[in-house]
A protein has these predicted regions:
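Extended, charged alpha/beta regions that create polyanion-binding interfaces
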Residues: 1-16
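A broad, low-specificity signal marking well-ordered, structured residues that form hydrophobic/aromatic
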Residues: 2, 34, 122-125, 206, ...
Length: 282
């Protein structure tokens, strides 16, 4: 088996004591970054309501903006939007935006639709194992031409075996984080309305495929259901939805704050232990 010890800014041992100067950001801890993805946009309206003809792209953007306002008011938290207007952003571009901002969590907001107007309830999705496997194959196939980092490590100068191990390690941790965050959001969603799925569901949605960012996709309700369309079109309910999403997101970061963040320092103190991962055969 292979044991990797990952340390947060550990220097080489020396015989002489040395003075370490930390930046102000290091001393106070960085913000956790949440990438909020408003589904669809521009020429892609998403689902359209049966009665009010509400467009999914407008509902998702409104909820995303409200959620960002809530997050940005919290000490140690910051949100970025993958789109902040009525324009289309490609699915992989959405992932790229999140990675460029070093996001700690990716939340994609949608409104569901079905041919039957009786379908109802919210759902929360994370990436399926099959989807993760296909994405891993894509990353490994393209690693020679990629300068992207996975979990802070470049794959382009690693041999195939080591690159595969590092990618698998990153994906395993990411999927665990995705499920943990999604479960907390799913629980909060159940407190404000009916749910289409009794538990977090798994699917191969493209926007969930970042190998190093915990990600979830939230279906806020069925826009094809007249009753839920009416609620989703209401500014009051959109605010309620944003508040609910924040509660789940905040619960996740309070329970599992990333190392080096202000939330982690408040919880554990400045001295944080390394994280140890054990890779077992098979």
């Amino acid at each position: 088996r292979l044991v990797l010890d990952l340390y947060d800014q550990v220097g080489k041992a020396t015989d002489e004591p040395r003075v370490v100067k930390h930046s102000q950001e290091t001393r106070k801890g960085r913000d956790v970054v949440i990438a909020i993805d408003a589904g669809h946009g521009g020429d892609d309206p998403g689902a359209i309501g049966r009665k009010l003809k509400s467009k999914e792209k407008h509902i998702t953007l409104s909820i995303a903006r409200k959620l960002k306002k809530i997050i940005d008011k919290q000490p140690g938290m910051r949100a970025i939007l993958t789109r902040d207007g009525d324009y289309y952003v490609g699915l992989r571009k959405r992932m790229k935006i999140a990675r460029q901002h070093h996001a700690d969590l990716f939340v994609s907001i949608h409104a569901d639709a079905f041919r039957s107007p009786k379908a109802h309830g919210s759902s929360v999705f994370v990436l399926s194992r099959r989807g993760a496997s296909s994405e891993a194959a894509r990353w490994l196939a393209a690693k020679e031409n990629a300068a992207d980092l996975v979990g802070g490590v470049s794959l382009d100068d690693k041999d195939d075996v080591l690159a595969s191990v590092l990618l698998d390690l990153s994906q395993t941790g990411t999927q665990a984080g995705s499920m943990s965050a999604a479960a907390k959001v799913h629980r909060e969603m159940g407190r404000i309305g009916r749910q289409h799925g009794k538990k977090v569901q798994q699917a191969g949605f493209m926007v969930l495929k970042s190998p190093d960012i915990p990600s979830m996709l939230v279906e806020t309700g069925f826009i094809s259901n007249p009753g839920e369309e009416r609620k989703l079109s209401s500014r009051k309910y959109q605010q309620k939805m944003a508040d609910t999403l924040f509660k789940g997101i905040n619960a996740y970061f309070q329970a599992e704050p990333p190392v080096g963040t202000l939330i982690a320092m408040k919880k554990h103190g400045p001295g944080q232990k390394s994280a140890k991962y054990v890779i077992k055969p098979g």
